[in-house]
Amino acid sequence: MEQLENEYEGKSDVMAYNYQIHQNAIPHCDDFLENGYTKEEMKLVNETNKIFNSDISITATAVRIPVMGGHSESINITLENPFDLNELISELKSFNGLEIKDDITNNIYPMPFYSRGSNNVYVGRIRKDFSCENSLNLWVVADNLRKGAATNAVQIAKLIVKNNLIN
């Protein structure tokens, strides 16, 4: 953040990144591994499979974008069966802590500034993926300082207690 703030002010003495970050997008988050992915990208792959206790086919490219906070992801999901997009969106609307911002006619879609200070996850740009059968695309945004591992752990713990899953 210090480098970004200094670049806004025209200073360039503090360089956390090898390149200017102001008005830039850097596809390099964490160290590169032998497989060409970064540690952060592999963390996304491994944590997703760990959470779902499966071997979901997943890939990721992590990009550093100069915003003061927030994580954004473009997600492509392939389902086993055909689906009705409106039914899927209705189902997503029922998830606690998930807010749909998906009205492209009025230019409403998730952006990092919506998420600032919120525990909600914002989802939009929900559409069928024409490149792959039974697939959809969506854009997801959350405040990484609020909706990270700690908040998720608290929410999961509350759910476990509420459903009497532990003594």
Residue ranges and their predicted role:
Residues 1-91:
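Active-site-lining helix/loop region of Rossmann-like oxidoreductase modules
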